[in-house]
Every structure is written in C-alpha cells, then in structure tokens.
Amino acid sequence: MKYKMIASDMDGTLVNDKSELTERTKQAIIKAVDAGVLFVAATGRPFSNVQNVNGLFDKDMPFIIFNGAAAYMGKSEKLLFERFLDFDLAKETFDIGQKLGIAQIVWTGPRLWGNRRCDKTVRYESISKNLSMSIVTDLAAIKDEVDGISKVLWIDDPAKVKELSAEMCAHFGTRLKCVSSMPHFLEFISNDAGKGTALEEIAKLYGIDRSEIIAIGDGQNDICMLKYAGFGVAVENAPDEVKAVCDYVTLSNNDDGVAEVIEKFILK
C-alpha cells in the first residue's frame, strides 16, 4: 500500500516527554514530505503552539488544532474549517465548572480566556506562546465580542479528571464531545468536531482515500482518528484502550515511534 497521508498527534506521540522533536523524527518527516506525502499534525493545542512542526516545512501543510474543532494551513495561516461549540452548551459547561470550583480555560478562536488566575491557568497561559489570558467569570459577558467558542477546558489532577469525564459524558450525552488530550485536561468540543472528523474533511480536500492514511496517537482523543485511518498506529506509551483499536504498535514517544513508522511504512 502506498500511503499518501500521515496524521500524528503531538503531545505523547510526535514529541518526547520534554516536548522536543528529535532530529531523527524531524528528518523522517522531512523525507516523507519530500517524497510527496502529506503530513498532518493533529493536536489539542492552539495554532500558535504548532510552530515547531510548521517550521520543518517549505510546503504549506494542514494542521488540526483544538482536538479537531478547527484546521489551518501552516504557512499561509488559511483557516480550512472551524466547528464552534454551541454557545448555550459552552455556557452550561462553564457554569458547571464554576460551581465545582474548577480551573477553566476557554478558547474563542485564537483568543485565550481563563476563569481566574491560579497556578493551573497561569501555567497553561505560559505554554500558550505569547498569548495573554483574559479573565471571564460568566460567558454571557463575552457572547457579543467573540465569533464562537472553540472549546472549554477543565484542568485538574488526573484522578479527578477521570471521575469528571465519566460524570460529564453521562450528563451531556451526545450533545457535545468530552475528550482528554492530557491526563489533567478535560475538554468540551462541538459534537461536529473531533480529530477523526477533521481528518476525514482534510482527506476529502486532498482527494485522499482513508485507506491511504496512516494515523498515529496515544490518547483517548486520538481514537476516532485512529479508527478512521486505513492504518492506525499506537505508540508504546499509549493505554491499552488505544492500542486495542490500532493495527500496529510502534516505539514510545521517547524512542522516536513516529520516525519508526515513517521509516518502516513510507521510506522503506
């Protein structure tokens, strides 16, 4: 099978635990792109936080951000699509978080909001690449000044996030998607969003069949993408529930798992 697209999650998959792209992985990606393969980074991060990958390319490559709630072209910064969360659902989510006393982040396109300044939200702000966090305590107050809500994100310890995820999935049902890109994050996005949906849309834009796609990931939020791709790959550090839906398990994110896949299935 000649694969035409590689889609890879970033944190826990493409980058190592120090958030670094290793030289081996960089070279594998560059060689794949030079061979005509489309490389798509698919992440929960905002667009401002994917420039370490974007900088590898001379070509304009698509990036899936906010766990599939939006996609941009890397060089031209052209918006390909955006799937906002229904405002009333976003407000309901935010209000529940306020009652529970949870540290919350809200993305409205490229703009960053937090429900208060605390260790968790300030740390998130610090990794958001030159973006300043505005404070909001009631989403109704910003409804008229934003285009829409890309996602609401709760930050808590991993055990609490696991508990909250089960509760919120039961509460919202199919009205929205609850996903977790990191053990301490619980994210709420539109039911029309998701990495799998976004990957399908990009594949259609480029005329690529799902059988011609390799997807690589490590988290619960990657499962829909891994299932959509013709060849789903889990990194070794992924939990068993992710490995169970995949066709292949590669090395861990600290051992150049993405590079191993590219070298074995693209550059062989």
What do the PLM-derived regions correspond to, one by one?
Residues 10, 45, 218-219:
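Active-site metal-binding loops of divalent metal-dependent hydrolases
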Residues 20-122:
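Active-site phosphate-binding/coordination module
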Residues 2-18:
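Asp-based phosphoryl-transfer active-site loop
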Residues 1-5, 22, 187-268:
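Mg2+-dependent phosphoryl-transfer enzymes with acidic/Ser/Thr/Gly-rich catalytic loops
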Residues 25, 50-54, 164, 168, ...:
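Hydrophobic packing residues within well-ordered alpha-helices of enzyme cores
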Residues 36-40, 59-61, 151, 211-212, ...:
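Short active-site oxyanion
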Residues 96, 100-216, 220, 224-225, ...:
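Conserved acidic, metal-coordinating active-site core of Asp-based
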